Amino acid sequence: MHCGLLEQPDMDSTESWIERCLSESENKCYSSHTSLGNISNDETDEEKENRASKPHSTPATLQWLGENYEIAEGVCIPRSALYMHYLDFCEKNDTQPVNAASFGKIIRQQFPQLTTRRLGTRGQSKYHYYGIAVKESSQYYDVMYSKKGAAWVNETGKKEVTKQTVAYSPRSKLGTLLPEFPNVKDLNLPSSLPEEKISTFIMMYRTHCQRILDTVIRANFDEVQSFLLHFWQGMPPHMLPVLGSSTVVNIVGVCDSILYKAISGVLMPTVLQALPDSLTQVIRKFAKQLDEWLKVALHDLPENLRNIKFELSKRFSQILRRQTSLNHLCQASRTVIHSADITFQMLEDWRNVDLNSITKQSLYTIEDSREEHRKLIIQLYQEFDHLLEDQSPIESYIDWLDSMVDRCVVKVASKKQGSLKKVAQQFLLIWSCFGTRVIRDMTLHSAPSFGSFHLIHLMFDDYVLYLLESLHCQERANELMRAMKGEAHGEIREERVLGEPAISTPSPVPFSPAASSSSVEIPSATSPVSNQSPEVGVVAATTGTMQSYTWSLTYTVTTAANGPGENGQQVPCMRSPHMTPSVTHRIPVYPHREDGYTGSYNYGTYSNQGHHPIASQYTSLPHESGLSGPLYTAYHRSSSQYPFNSQTRMEPCLMSGATRLHPSQVAPRWPDVTSTNTCFTSPTMHSARYANTSDMYTSLAPRRNSDYEHMQHFPGFAYINGEASAGWAK
């Protein structure tokens, strides 16, 4: 029984060694064994201890902890994993390790603020050290246990996907505190704003935001609505006069930016970490409902306050939706990237791409393309080639995308303030063009790994957009911070979120059956300043016989109880000799009970509206001198076109027995062609219209099923006749 240890010359007392041998034999009697008869880890640890020739040194252990670990808020390391690092350190230094309990006391000597948490599902929970992270310079560095906190990777470091993925839960972030809010001492307040009122408002608003964050962490999203309503509608009367000041509006914008960033980090710390399906659905629902909750809560408050709240909430909702979709794509892409066979085929197809041709076509999107742009594209191409060749994990691809955006957008935009949006748009244009040409080249050459590249391309596109949207939000927060401190003057610029046009949100007013004059406005993609299309007035002449026109698809339906001519407005696509202004009725969202609210919208007044004839706004075209009248005959928008009381506006068109959209047949310009407003309720009617047309595209023949190995290179996507169909695989 380890009698050889008694012969060591550096023993101080044989009695201590006898006691140790007795304790070891007792531990062996109660050691556990696996089902295959393998000795447990306890015996392995004992063998390591017995092989050690040096006694344990606490100062050396403390020095090792300081060199390899650091304090980091929000990072958890399993207690067993940290102890395994310690055993490895002892083995390499030939020192005798202490047990786990004694090692825990040594850790707290180095990091006194360290806490312990029990995390995991019921029956599988484990103790974790909370607030400590592995340094990037450490040999034990793992992204999962670092400050970056990128993803859950397996402990062995292999590239195969772990069979059991640990699902993230926001409840692990309970107790998270918001960062510091602006201090009233740092603000340049005007004389009309009392400092004590602003200080009180900041304190109240921080408490309100902290309650919202705690509610989100507990996943009780429905309570957020009541918090918003109670805070804004229950505002003390003496605080109402200061809410409309630009200083308070900027303070609210800065605080909302801090809150939304904290919520985003709590719900999804990283897009690479797997989320439960239930949490994903709840996050999407929360992003959809937040705007409606704010409309209700901010009723009757100053317009500039509502505008800044709506703007930031829309950006926040867009980022949440982007994160959920990106998380799904990352989980599907992980399977592709971590497969050695697939990455080898992808590397071979990647090197067969015509890089010179694609680079030239991509540089056409730049007004003043230079040689440095071409070199940068080639450099990025080679970096991606190295990632495929090294069979890097998905975390390396994410780091590469981060560095690419930093080099191409952040550093370029930092040279000139306020140029981030323009630089980001130019980068997105080149990025989209290059990726599209690569996919096209692989399609033409029937690349075997086309499906895998398509999936990776989708994930890369979403992640780049996510990074740019985050940069956009950060720049907006910095603008509000400068405006709040008095460093910037002028009105706050309203910028649009990438990928989502800015839509002006109407202010809700109490609904009253007497006030029936209303209009339903469909927002335009053009500038909100001018409602005129480029074609109003003189039609510019172009070279040649062909002349193209761009007509705005924006229209406004104006209704009035007194008649068709009151407060009517014609928009660019509606032909009329002049434009008349209209006041848009703001549909109620949360009306007061005393105003007759019945729980639903009342569209009864729409049945009394009159017809609105659309006169000609454009004269005869120069190259069609034979036309003396308008291009189209006038038609009327009747109440049957907008059946608001039905479930959907398209329901009458989809039902075979429904009435026509127009009460009477409209005389078309070309009599031999069926009217464009006709609903085709049978294939016979559809073929009758297009039977004699020669300019229709013929149906493409389905690809052979042997062209692609469907599921080998395209996991997570369904194939229909050889074509990939992406969707949420829930």
Swiss-Prot record:
Renumbered residue ranges of the record's region Disordered: 30-59, 500-532
Instruction: Show the ranges annotated as biased composition (Low complexity).
Output: 512-528
Q: Where in the cell is it found?
A: Nucleus
Q: Which keywords accompany this UniProt record? A: DNA-binding, Nucleus, Transcription, Transcription regulation
A GO MF term: DNA-binding transcription factor activity, RNA polymerase II-specific
Is the keyword Magnesium in the record? no
- InterPro entries, A to Z: DNA-bd_RFX (IPR003150), RFX-like (IPR039779), WH-like_DNA-bd_sf (IPR036388), WH_DNA-bd_sf (IPR036390)
| DNA-binding residues (ranges) | 61-136
Compositional bias of kind Polar residues: 30-41
Q: Which GO terms describe its biological process?
A: regulation of transcription by RNA polymerase II
Quote the disruption phenotype from the UniProt entry: Morpholino-mediated knockdown in embryos results in the failure of neural folds closure at stage 18. Impaired ciliogenesis in the neural tube.
Q: Does the keyword Cell inner membrane apply?
A: no
Any one of the GO CC terms:
nucleus
Q: Which domain of life is it from?
A: Eukaryota
Family to which the UniProt record says this protein belongs: Belongs to the RFX family.
Question: PANTHER family this protein is in?
Answer: RFX TRANSCRIPTION FACTOR FAMILY, TRANSCRIPTION FACTOR RFX4
Function of the molecule: Required for neural tube ciliogenesis during embryogenesis.
Protein's name according to its UniProt entry: Regulatory factor X 4
What is the organism of origin for this protein?
Answer: Xenopus laevis (African clawed frog)
